[in-house]
Amino acid sequence: MSTVYDAKSLDEINVHFILCTERTGSSLLCLMLNLHPEIISPSEEPFALYLHSKYHRIVTWTDEDISSYVDDFFLLAEKNMDLYFTQRAIFHAELLANKNLLTYERIVKISYLNFYDSDQKNKSSVRVIVDKQIKYVYHLDKIQHLFPSAKFLLLVRDVRDNIVSKSIRKLNWNKHPFFLAAIWKGAYSRMLALPENNRLILKFEELIQSPESALKKACSFLSLEFSSNMLNTEGVFENYVDSQKEKLDPAFTEKLLAFHSGIRSPLDSKKIGQYKAFLSQRELQIIEGQCQYYLEIVNYELSNKKKTGIIRFSLYQFLAFLYRPFLLMIYLRIPLALKRKLKKRRNKRMSIPV
């Protein structure tokens, strides 16, 4: 049976965001947040931003509008919806059951609440949605316009360790440490420009070494009571994946568990400071010098404060700008109809049903 909401209850659910770059412990933080009975932290999907231009002006939603929204939602999805989202037919039926109260903000909230099956996450007590989306770092003005009451958890990891972790996982187009440092610098320069009363800095290192302290800060910032259940992460991810295994390809499941090995293992502080065995003194000197301002804001110790390699770093900084904010800006400006065509073509190449 579809959940029927009332407008007041939906409007009282707050939407907040985790901002970060890759390999900062965001999957662990989301796992912990989802163990709080009043929080849902969905799998990262940028639908709220990408569907806004087409649907935000609708005042009276029709069955056709809802069908179109569902089609676009699933077509533009970037992650594995079989794993994280309710069945398409159930989602569609729930939107139809709530048709008379829909606004764009409410349909977005209902969409968020359809992440994770109800037998895995009780939605009835959810008061706060915390969306983690790396892309939103580069669209903060639009996100603040969409959600003017949103607060932002800034999850930060020492740029030096972040570089090593990304290199090991072979993330990003360019693996050069200066390019990865420039990605970090570009992301946190945007995040740290947010008003201080509207953001909370959470450090990866504290989340690993003092998780209760970090989570208490996060809960207080979100105006919630801390739940000790948030610390009981052992086996949670494996059990969730196991509950969904009938929907998933075994090879995908194996890759997924391997990729998220970090949240399947006990918290390990050995990954803190691992850069000392990977980065050369010359690389450290340039990275610390170029990221110094932001490293000091978030209280990371530096071995060097001399700015060197400015010209060389500037080249990688320009490449990082093209790779992240510029490409994301271009994609956002592409009309939704063209986004649909591009995604259909991509799915066809990959033999994904559309």
Regions found by a protein language model. Give the residues of each.
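PAPS-dependent sulfotransferases, especially Golgi type II membrane carbohydrate sulfotransferases
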Residues: 1-17, 115, 120-123, 192, ...
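Short, conserved clusters of charged catalytic residues that mark active-site
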Residues: 13-14, 24, 135-138, 186, ...
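P-loop (Walker A) phosphate-binding loop of NTP-binding proteins
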Residues: 21
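A conserved segment at the C-terminal end of the G1
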Residues: 27-39
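Active-site micro-motifs of SAM-dependent methyltransferase domains
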Residues: 35, 41, 47, 161, ...
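Conserved catalytic segments around the Walker B and adjacent sensor/switch elements
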Residues: 40-43, 200
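PAPS-dependent sulfation machinery
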Residues: 42-131, 136
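PAPS-dependent sulfotransferase catalytic domain
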Residues: 117-231, 236-262
